[in-house]
Every structure is written in C-alpha cells, then in structure tokens.
Amino acid sequence: MTRQSLWDLSETDVEDGEIRINVGGFKRRLRSHTLLRFPETRLGRLLLCHSREAILELCDDYDDVQREFYFDRNPELFPYVLHFYHTGKLHVMAELCVFSFSQEIEYWGINEFFIDSCCSYSYHGRKVEPEQEKWDEQSDQESTTSSFDEILAFYNDASKFDGQPLGNFRRQLWLALDNPGYSVLSRVFSVLSILVVLGSIITMCLNSLPDFQIPDSQGNPGEDPRFEIVEHFGIAWFTFELVARFAVAPDFLKFFKNALNLIDLMSIVPFYITLVVNLVVESSPTLANLGRVAQVLRLMRIFRILKLARHSTGLRSLGATLKYSYKEVGLLLLYLSVGISIFSVVAYTIEKEENEGLATIPACWWWATVSMTTVGYGDVVPGTTAGKLTASACILAGILVVVLPITLIFNKFSHFYRRQKQLESAMRSCDFGDGMKEVPSVNLRDYYAHKVKSLMASLTNMSRSSPSELSLDDSLH
C-alpha cells in the first residue's frame, strides 16, 4: 500500500474504512475509527503511518493487496485486546502468567491503567506475590547458608578437643554449658542458671522496698543481710559459670568475642568493682565520693536479665532481628522525627500563649513524642480546640507511622526465629561419639560439613511442607 492510500484510509474514510488484523492465525476485520479511539496504542499508531517502513516497524508483516497486518503474537490474548478497543476496558486473561500478560499489553501499547476494576486488584496482587515469594526464598536460602556456617563452626570447635588432654571430657562439659537442651545435664544446668538469674533480679527489686531495708548506724537505708546472702550466692554462681565456660572453651581467644560471654562478664564485673570501691572508701574517707560510683554500678545488676538470652530462642531471635533490621528501625525513627518536628511546631504556635506546658518547642517535642507513640502520660495537654484537633491528628499519624515499619520487622523476626529453631534442632542432632574416629582417610571437617548440609536441607524442606504433605510422607515411610 502506498503512503497516500493508507493516509486516505485513516483520514478521509474513517467511518467505513476497514483493515484486516492477523494475530498468529486469528483474523479479524476492524473499523479504523474503532482503533483511532486510542491513537497511542500500537494499532492506533499503525493507521497514522506514512510509509511502508513505518508500518513494518509496528507489525511483523503487511499484505498490500489484502491490506492485512500480521502480528506474530499470542492469538488467545488478542480477543481481550479487541474487547478493550470496543469498550475501553481491559480484562485480564486468568490462564496467562501475569508477567506474560503484562508484556503482551505493553506490546500492544495498552496501559495497565485501563484494566477494569473487577480484575485490577487480583492482577496487581499476582504481580506482587512473586516478589514476596522471591524475598522469602532468598531469605530461606540465606538462613540455610548462615545456619550451615554456624553449625560448621560449631563442629570445627568441637573437633579442636581431639588430641588435647581430657579432650572428650572437656568437650562434653563444653556442650553441656554452651548448648541448653543438648543433654539432660545441660537442661539441668540451664534450669539452675535461669533460677539464679531470676532470683537475683527479684532480690534486687525487693531490696528497693522500704519494708525490706535496714537502717545503718547513720540512719541511711541499707540492704537486708538475707538479700546480701542471695546476692553473693548469685555472684558466686555467675563467676563459676563464666570460669567453667572459659576453662572448657575450645578457643580462648574467640571466647570473649561471643556476645553471650560478654554479657556473662558484664553481669559480675560491677559487683567486683563495687567491692573494690567500698574497700577504698573505708580505708580512705577522703575518697567518699567514689561511693556514688558504687551506687551507679549496683544499678547495672538489672542487665543480668540479658543472661536469659542464652536459654531463650526468642531473645536471641530478637537480638538478630534488631541487628539486621537497622534500616527498618532507622526508617521508624525517621518517620517519628519528622512527625514530632511538625506537630511540635504546630502545637507551639497554637498553645504558646494559652498553655505554659507548651510554651517552648522543646517542651512540645516531649508532648509530640508521647502522643505519636500513643503513650499519652497526660502531664501536658492542649487546652484550645485547635490544639486538641492537632493532638488528634498527631495520635492518628503516630499509629500509621509505627505500624508501617513494624510489619517488616515482624517478618524478619519470624524468619530469624524459624532459623534459630532449625539451628537448635541441628545441634541437638549432633553426634560426637567414637564412631567418627573409626572412619579412616576421611577429613573430619568435611564429613561434618556434608552431614550438616544434608541435615539443614531436610529441616528447610520440612519447614516448607504443609501438614498434609508431612502426614503423607509419614504414611509412606
């Protein structure tokens, strides 16, 4: 077809002109005015071409005699395209992959904006699901790899006892002390450690009550001797626990690089520093101000509660979540900072002349902080109508700001909790019997690595299987 005849078809014979469309063998006659309703689409631009070269840039082939345009595309989807030209609404082909459908409509020059409301929600939901599944799969893969590395390091540490004096005995003690749930001995030791930690915390809390305080010779409140006995027993237990772990550690240099061991150290150091300070103050009254240091150090006993992280999967998962969620936590703090800055200035502008509690912007920062976090102490409240409306908006904004990043943090917590449970299950399945030493010409580390990799793969598959699949597997075996 010449340039003039095609242009005449689209300009002078718009009402009656027809063109033939062949999409993978699916043929249809279409009126030109139907296609020109959407001139930005591929078929609409086809009618506005001025040369054969321009036509062939938009279609795969063109028959001058039949005036037929050929497209080597999916013929099953083209009826949906035709329906769009007739009604202006695009429906989604459910049988086709959502990304293939997206590529097809992009080829035809149809924007996703034209997808009808009945299909829009499911279409965009199906596009998001693969991204979420990809993130979950990547997280599971990273979890398995990280867990495998940790267990491999665990096996490597255990193998260091081979050839050492009392190596097998020290290894069993190390497993019992460092891995709660590994054996009956480790469970008993774990329960005793938890009871001592809780007893120490409860004693510290009860000691703050006036009914349990005994005045000294100067009338100052002092500790009950019974509580001091409990405190000294707790310190003795914590010291024994730390020294025992250090004595049976496979690598003394790496011992204090472990965060849990640092927590154990910090739980007893304040007591010994306080003991030294008290001795110095008693021997030299001029250094009485050092007694304040001892009082501050005594408050650090509350951090002993962190020792429970060694015995709690949830606490360790929480620590890992906070470690790897710094972006989400930073995002949460950023949202709160922006909201606090905005609402504090608004409250200051409205309430500065009516309310002494909101007479300065720093004072308004405090009010905006407790309002956005929905704490609401009630110590400072706006008095004007405009101030109350501002407070309502501040509270609603705080709810939205806190909820958005919390979902991401919760997903990561679930991920790390599942990983930690798999890690503990794998460690409880470890076997350090003499059977390993009976295998000659096999590298112990490689054997451990192969065994752990198989174990982690099976645990990951089990976590992905549904209950029905698990029951079916059990019935087959």
UniProtKB/Swiss-Prot annotation:
Topological region Extracellular: 207-225, 281-290, 349-361, 382-388
InterPro entries assigned: BTB/POZ_dom (IPR000210), Ion_trans_dom (IPR005821), K_chnl_volt-dep_Kv (IPR003968), K_chnl_volt-dep_Kv5/Kv9 (IPR003971), SKP1/BTB/POZ_sf (IPR011333), T1-type_BTB (IPR003131), VG_K_chnl (IPR028325), Volt_channel_dom_sf (IPR027359)
Pfam family, any one: Ion_trans
Domain of life of the source: Eukaryota
One of the GO BP terms on file: action potential
TM region positions: 185-206, 226-248, 260-280, 291-311, 327-348, 389-417
Major localization class: membrane
Tissue expression remark: Detected in brain, lung and in pulmonary arteries.
Keyword set, alphabetical order: Cell membrane, Ion channel, Ion transport, Membrane, Potassium, Potassium channel, Potassium transport, Transmembrane, Transmembrane helix, Transport, Voltage-gated channel
Intramembrane segments as residue ranges: 362-373, 374-381
UniProt short sequence motif Selectivity filter, positions renumbered to this chain: 374-379
Membrane topology (Cytoplasmic): 1-184, 249-259, 312-326, 418-477
Gene3D superfamilies assigned to the protein according to its UniProt record, in alphabetical order: 1.10.287.70, Potassium Channel Kv1.1, Chain A, Voltage-gated potassium channels. Chain C
Protein's job: Potassium channel regulatory subunit that modulate the delayed rectifier voltage-gated potassium channel activity of KCNB1 and KCNB2 by altering their kinetics, expression levels, and shifting the half-inactivation potential to more polarized values. While it does not form functional channels on its own, it can form functional heterotetrameric channels with KCNB1 and KCNB2. Each regulatory subunit has unique regulatory properties that can lead to extensive inhibition, significant changes in kinetics, and/or substantial shifts in the voltage dependencies of the inactivation process.
Domain notes: The transmembrane segment S4 functions as a voltage-sensor and is characterized by a series of positively charged amino acids at every third position. Channel opening and closing is effected by a conformation change that affects the position and orientation of the voltage-sensor paddle formed by S3 and S4 within the membrane. A transmembrane electric field that is positive inside would push the positively charged S4 segment outwards, thereby opening the pore, while a field that is negative inside would pull the S4 segment inwards and close the pore.
Subunit comment: Heterotetramer with KCNB1 and KCNB2. Does not form homomultimers.
Descriptive protein name: Delayed-rectifier potassium channel regulatory subunit KCNS2
Organism annotation: Rattus norvegicus (Rat)
